[in-house]
Amino acid sequence: MLNIEQIKEIIPHRYPFLLVDQVLEVEEGKRAVGIKNVSANEEFFNGHFPEYAVMPGVLIVEALAQVGAIAILKKEENRGRLAFFGGIDHCRFKKQVRPGDQLRLEVELTRVRGPIGKGKAVATVDGEIVCEAEITFALGEKKE
């Protein structure tokens, strides 16, 4: 299990764009399972939507991508690198995510060749799928 400080040692995201609160499981280079506690205080709820708060789907996908990045960047040879979002395929949103929900974010890396990889990503709330997608990423170096 990884807490928020340990997550911040692996990926560069910070508030308000760090969308993973904890990691429950990680198999380096293979898969990871994370949690995002969706609070009524999230900044994005101010505009999406003021009268009926719904977490934007693109942020659910971004949260999944961050969990996938943790899975690949936890691997020893990738430490200190960056994982860039490369693409989304077959993305479907099945249910709304509202304040008070706990998102369970699961990403299984299905193919990694050189600096390019793909993963099967599934987000659930209370065991029900809210989003699923195939995500593509590219590993890169930090440039000073």
UniProtKB/Swiss-Prot annotation:
Its EC number is 4.2.1.59. It holds the Pfam family FabA. GO terms for cellular component: cytoplasm; membrane. It is found in: Cytoplasm. InterPro entries: FabA_FabZ (IPR013114), FabZ (IPR010084), HotDog_dom_sf (IPR029069). It catalyses: a (3R)-hydroxyacyl-[ACP] = a (2E)-enoyl-[ACP] + H2O. The keyword Lipid metabolism applies. CDD domains: FabZ. The active site is at H48. One of its GO terms (biological process) is lipid A biosynthetic process. The keyword Ribonucleoprotein does not apply. SUPFAM superfamilies: Thioesterase/thiol ester dehydrase-isomerase. One of its GO terms (molecular function) is (3R)-hydroxyacyl-[acyl-carrier-protein] dehydratase activity. PANTHER family: 3-HYDROXYACYL-[ACYL-CARRIER-PROTEIN] DEHYDRATASE. Involved in unsaturated fatty acids biosynthesis. Catalyzes the dehydration of short chain beta-hydroxyacyl-ACPs and long chain saturated and unsaturated beta-hydroxyacyl-ACPs. This is 3-hydroxyacyl-[acyl-carrier-protein] dehydratase FabZ. It comes from Bacillus cytotoxicus (strain DSM 22905 / CIP 110041 / 391-98 / NVH 391-98). The lineage of its organism: Bacteria, Bacillati, Bacillota, Bacilli, Bacillales. The gene is fabZ.
